[in-house]
Amino acid sequence: LICIAPLTNIGLLFAMDPKIPSLLKRIVLMCGSPTYTRYDGTSETMSAMDKSDLIVLGSKGVIENNALIDPHATKLVYGAEVKEHVTCGLNVTSRLIMKPEEAEKIFHHPLLEPVLDIAREWFKDEERVTFHDPLTAVSLFHEDVCRFERGKLEIETDSRLLSGFTYWRPDENGPHRVAMDVDKELFYQYLFEVFR
């Protein structure tokens, strides 16, 4: 199962039938921001591990949108007993950025024209497109595109200000595998080779 949006429907499904998670071979999610890294030239990196670490409050992108929209469903999904729990969060997806002129050159296949149309709308506000969901889809078929670490992700639901925040704790016996790095060149190769 691949999840690239807020987890309301999946959380509801799991709540309605708690046996469903155990029937899944794997769940791959674009969700959360397991670690926080600034890509503005300061090279500041911090782990998002401690509830007392409130410096992240003012940092853009620390709470990922899918988790923010429905933190309770997100918590339920991450707590479900799935055979394999895989996450690609903002810590890796935000590294896959393309400028408008690059997209115009690359998105020339007929199947990509609707994607380019959507990207053009995005460019009106952002001047870039970020490949959040495509990385999640590519990693489903090509796990070598990311370096994963095992651990435990917990979702904040008690704090009004931090609702949806993801707490990451590395643990070799943990239930979650989280992408910590991405091979950009390999990602673009896998993504676009299907359109040749």
What are these regions (language model features)?
Residues 1-87, 93:
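Active-site histidine-anchored catalytic micro-motif
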Residues 50-52, 65-196:
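Conformational coupling and interaction surfaces
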